[in-house]
Amino acid sequence: MAELRLPPNSVVKKGREHKEQEEMLKPRKIKIYRYDPDLDKNPTIDSFEIDLSKTGPMILDALIKIKNEIDSTLTFRRSCREGICGSCAMNIDGTNTLACIKPIEDISGDIKIYPLPHMKVVKDLVPDMSHFYAQYESIEPWLKTDSPTPSNSERLQSIKDREKLDGLYECILCACCSTSCPSYWWNGDKYLGPAILLQAYRWIADSRDDNTGERLEALEDPFKLYRCHTIMNCTKTCPKGLNPAKAIGKIKSLIAERHGL
């Protein structure tokens, strides 16, 4: 269960203000959460005013500009810049999304950027994903089969069976959905959350997997699965347009069928 008493250093204070010295054609203020555990200080919100006429169109472009030209200590994850790797997931203007595909022009007023909520912060905009990945490992995300591996071909799958994986395999494990889920906020130590459960259903739905029963038994738990209350935050925030709530519903239906319900 989540700890309800906030530690003293959880209070976010006003930080430094940075402004470009040259005249700006399209000035824009970006407020960024800053936290360094090595400094033993409270988190702060630093303000950066940049010229949008001299940067790219996405939030990640602005962050890179700030890091390269204003404050090299700003810390965040990024890699592909194409919405594929999930590294740059963060909370932007109150919504969990990917910085690399979030247009600056979609946001009115000051831009507010925080790390993904309800995760320990490693530094600045970098969340600790260790627990999330441990939960992913727990569902055994690989084909489990007792049949021998074909000697001269892959494990074949019909087009119809392959289509059952659409809307599942595209998940990039960015954790935007799980960290937008109130049930995961309060029970993240036991509840697997929408991202991991969508991944679990991806293997349950795979016709090449022979361990559907075993997988369903592992998920049939008051906390692992049934903390989902169909709030739908996960589906609303997914940057890939997936529907984790639907996948969770299908898992629940399969378990009910096993019990003749």
UniProtKB/Swiss-Prot annotation:
<dbReference type="InterPro" id="IPR001041">
    <property type="entry name" value="2Fe-2S_ferredoxin-type"/>
</dbReference>
<keyword id="KW-0560">Oxidoreductase</keyword>
<keyword id="KW-0408">Iron</keyword>
<dbReference type="GO" id="GO:0008177">
    <property type="term" value="F:succinate dehydrogenase (quinone) activity"/>
</dbReference>
<keyword id="KW-0249">Electron transport</keyword>
<feature type="binding site">
    <location>
        <position position="228"/>
    </location>
    <ligand>
        <name>[3Fe-4S] cluster</name>
    </ligand>
</feature>
<feature type="binding site">
    <location>
        <position position="174"/>
    </location>
    <ligand>
        <name>[4Fe-4S] cluster</name>
    </ligand>
</feature>
<feature type="binding site">
    <location>
        <position position="238"/>
    </location>
    <ligand>
        <name>[4Fe-4S] cluster</name>
    </ligand>
</feature>
<dbReference type="Pfam" id="PF13085">
    <property type="entry name" value="Fer2_3"/>
</dbReference>
<keyword id="KW-0813">Transport</keyword>
<feature type="domain" description="2Fe-2S ferredoxin-type">
    <location>
        <begin position="28"/>
        <end position="119"/>
    </location>
</feature>
<feature type="binding site">
    <location>
        <position position="80"/>
    </location>
    <ligand>
        <name>[2Fe-2S] cluster</name>
    </ligand>
</feature>
<dbReference type="GO" id="GO:0006099">
    <property type="term" value="P:tricarboxylic acid cycle"/>
</dbReference>
<comment type="subunit">
    <text>Part of an enzyme complex containing four subunits: a flavoprotein, an iron-sulfur, cytochrome b-556, and a hydrophobic anchor protein.</text>
</comment>
<dbReference type="GO" id="GO:0051538">
    <property type="term" value="F:3 iron, 4 sulfur cluster binding"/>
</dbReference>
<keyword id="KW-0003">3Fe-4S</keyword>
<feature type="binding site">
    <location>
        <position position="234"/>
    </location>
    <ligand>
        <name>[3Fe-4S] cluster</name>
    </ligand>
</feature>
<dbReference type="InterPro" id="IPR006058">
    <property type="entry name" value="2Fe2S_fd_BS"/>
</dbReference>
<dbReference type="GO" id="GO:0046872">
    <property type="term" value="F:metal ion binding"/>
</dbReference>
<dbReference type="GO" id="GO:0051537">
    <property type="term" value="F:2 iron, 2 sulfur cluster binding"/>
</dbReference>
<dbReference type="InterPro" id="IPR012675">
    <property type="entry name" value="Beta-grasp_dom_sf"/>
</dbReference>
<dbReference type="Pfam" id="PF13534">
    <property type="entry name" value="Fer4_17"/>
</dbReference>
<feature type="binding site">
    <location>
        <position position="177"/>
    </location>
    <ligand>
        <name>[4Fe-4S] cluster</name>
    </ligand>
</feature>
<dbReference type="InterPro" id="IPR017896">
    <property type="entry name" value="4Fe4S_Fe-S-bd"/>
</dbReference>
<feature type="binding site">
    <location>
        <position position="85"/>
    </location>
    <ligand>
        <name>[2Fe-2S] cluster</name>
    </ligand>
</feature>
<dbReference type="InterPro" id="IPR009051">
    <property type="entry name" value="Helical_ferredxn"/>
</dbReference>
<feature type="binding site">
    <location>
        <position position="100"/>
    </location>
    <ligand>
        <name>[2Fe-2S] cluster</name>
    </ligand>
</feature>
<dbReference type="InterPro" id="IPR050573">
    <property type="entry name" value="SDH/FRD_Iron-Sulfur"/>
</dbReference>
<feature type="region of interest" description="Disordered">
    <location>
        <begin position="1"/>
        <end position="22"/>
    </location>
</feature>
<feature type="domain" description="4Fe-4S ferredoxin-type">
    <location>
        <begin position="161"/>
        <end position="191"/>
    </location>
</feature>
<dbReference type="InterPro" id="IPR004489">
    <property type="entry name" value="Succ_DH/fum_Rdtase_Fe-S"/>
</dbReference>
<keyword id="KW-0004">4Fe-4S</keyword>
<keyword id="KW-0411">Iron-sulfur</keyword>
<keyword id="KW-0479">Metal-binding</keyword>
<dbReference type="GO" id="GO:0022904">
    <property type="term" value="P:respiratory electron transport chain"/>
</dbReference>
<protein>
    <recommendedName>
        <fullName>Succinate dehydrogenase iron-sulfur subunit</fullName>
        <ecNumber>1.3.5.1</ecNumber>
    </recommendedName>
</protein>
<keyword id="KW-0816">Tricarboxylic acid cycle</keyword>
<dbReference type="InterPro" id="IPR025192">
    <property type="entry name" value="Succ_DH/fum_Rdtase_N"/>
</dbReference>
<comment type="pathway">
    <text>Carbohydrate metabolism; tricarboxylic acid cycle; fumarate from succinate (bacterial route): step 1/1.</text>
</comment>
<comment type="similarity">
    <text>Belongs to the succinate dehydrogenase/fumarate reductase iron-sulfur protein family.</text>
</comment>
<dbReference type="InterPro" id="IPR017900">
    <property type="entry name" value="4Fe4S_Fe_S_CS"/>
</dbReference>
<dbReference type="GO" id="GO:0009055">
    <property type="term" value="F:electron transfer activity"/>
</dbReference>
